[in-house]
């Protein structure tokens, strides 16, 4: 598909709709066709200058290609257009995390999740930063909120179990690990952590 020709062709009415062009850009970005994605986002921004979506998309592909400064500019433009963009806050959080500004990343991930508790990128980013900072209570809350909406997500369940274990909430961690193994009996990480916790509990009981 010649994206440039299609985008510039006035006879292609469907390519003159913001939603179509924006979604096409997201599709290209998801498969790593960044130049085609960029052209779509530029067209989408021209069609709807006040929409944040094209700038969020541009920020994502700039970040994927290692152009951190350009990504940050794009995410900040998105936030000027829409201060409630969860994805833009998550994008700035990822940049802060990559550049070692953990406190700033933590706050930006929290803001992203306040706006959309279903944002898995922000949730896992907050998990990583929380582990680096040793701050667990807020990410535990958002992991629980996410699991209320996605109760069978074993990857998030394991993140929550690991944090509970580190935070001294051993009973809840064990319950989560057993739930994971009932859903995925071959989940090696969950099995190993459960064995470690059961061994720890047995040692404590012996004392």
Q: What residues fall within each predicted segment?
A:
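TPR-adjacent "capping" and linker segments in tetratricopeptide-repeat scaffold/adaptor proteins
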Residues: 4-20
